[in-house]
Amino acid sequence: MKPQFSQLHVLRHDKWLLSCLTWIPILLALLIWGVFSAGIARDLPIGVVDNAHSTLSRKLTHMLDASSTMSVDYQFSDLLQAKNAMIEGKVYAYVIIPEHFDRDIYLQRAPQVSVFYNSQYILIGRLISSAVVQAQGFFNAGLETVKSLSHGNSTVQGALGNAVTISTQISPLFNQNTNYAQFLVSAVVPAIWQIMIVVCSILILAANLRVYARKPEHLDRWLGNQPFKVISKTLAAYLPIFLLHGFAFLFWFYFMLDWPFQGHLLPIMIAQLATTIACMIMGAFFFFMTLDAARAMSFAGAFTAPSFAFMGITFPVSDMGSLAQFWRSLLPISHYIEVQVAQASYGTSALTSLTHLLPMASYVLPAFLAVVLAKRHLKKTEATNVPV
C-alpha cells in the first residue's frame, strides 16, 4: 500500500491528528482574534488624587478624561487609596495634583503633577504615558493662550501661536488606525501556523509508524529501503492542507476583515510554500532524532516557542542579542513574516520580497540529517531482526 494513498486510513485511526489538521487551528485563530478584536485600547481606567480641589485642577482632570485612551473612573482622597486601587487592578495609573495648584500656576512656579502607572503592562503603560503627556500639553497650551490674551494680544490665533511656538503633525504610516488586532493577530496567527505544521508533521510520522510498522523495531515495514522517498510522499500528502490553512488566514485578514493590503498575494503564497516545507523538514528531523513522538514534541516546543517574540514585530531585530538573532534565523516563520509585511504593508516588488526567503535554502541540512537518522534507525532495526 503506497503511503500517499493510505493517509485516510491513518487519519481514521488517529482522531487527534485529524483534529489538529481541521478544527483546532481554526479554534486557536478565532481565540486569538477574540482577545484582540477590540483593535484599539480605549477608556483605560485611571484615578486622580486632587489635593487642590480648584477650578484649574478640575479642568486638568476633565482634560485627562477627555482623552480617548483614558477614563478617569476614580477620585481618590489620598495616595494610599490610589496605590491600593492599582495593586487591586482597578486602575492602570493615577495622577496626583498638588496643593496650591492654581496659586503656583498664577505665580509661574510650575507646579509638578505626578503620574504613576503600572509598567508591568508595557503596552498599556506606553499608551497612558503618551495620553497624559498629550492631555497636559493641551492644558498648558490653553493656559498660555489665556495668559497671552490677558496681556493684550487681540487675536486667539496670535495668542495660540505664542503658546505653541512649533506645531507638530505626527502621521502614522502602514497601520494608520494603530489597530492592535491588525498589528498583533497578523503575526500571532502565522506563528501558531508554524507550530501546528511542525507538531502535525511529528504526529503524521508517528501515526504512520504506529499504523504501518506497529513498533519502532519494525521500522523497515514502513520505510523499506527508500526512507527519503517514503517520508517525502507521506508528508507531501498533507502539504495542501497546510497551504490551505495559510491561504485561509490571508483571506481572513485581507478580504473578510479588509485590512490594508498594498502588494500582491503571489509572493506571500510562494513564501507560505517554502515555510511549510521547511516546517515539515524540522518536524521530520525532530521525530527521527528519537523515533519517539513525546520527545520530538519537546524538541519542537523548545524550537518554536519564541516564534512570535523573535519575529521582529513587537521588538526590533536590530536590538536583539546575538543569540536571539541566531535563533530567529533558524525559525522558518521569521523569514516568512518579512515577505508578508513587505507585501501587505509596504507593497515592495515581488523579487525584493522573495529575497528574504534565500536563507531558507539552509533547511536542506536538517532534511539531509533526517534521512541519515532514518537510515541509522533502519540499520538498527535490521541488526535487531537478524535471525540467530
Residue ranges and their predicted role:
Residues 56-60, 201, 339:
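Hydrophobic alpha-helical segments typical of transmembrane helices
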Residues 1-181, 383-388:
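Extracytoplasmic/periplasmic domains immediately adjacent to an N-terminal transmembrane anchor
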Residues 6, 10-13, 175-184, 222-230, ...:
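Membrane-helix interfacial "entry" motifs
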Residues 240, 251-252, 259-388:
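Membrane-spanning alpha-helical segments of multipass transporters and channels
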Residues 157-167, 245, 330-341:
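Peri-membrane helix termini and adjoining interfacial loops of integral membrane proteins
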Residues 20-21, 232-233, 299:
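Hydrophobic core positions of alpha-helical segments in small-molecule transporters
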Residues 26, 30, 127, 196-200, ...:
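Transmembrane alpha-helix boundary/anchor motif
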Residues 28-30, 171-253:
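Hydrophobic alpha-helical transmembrane segments of multi-pass membrane transport proteins
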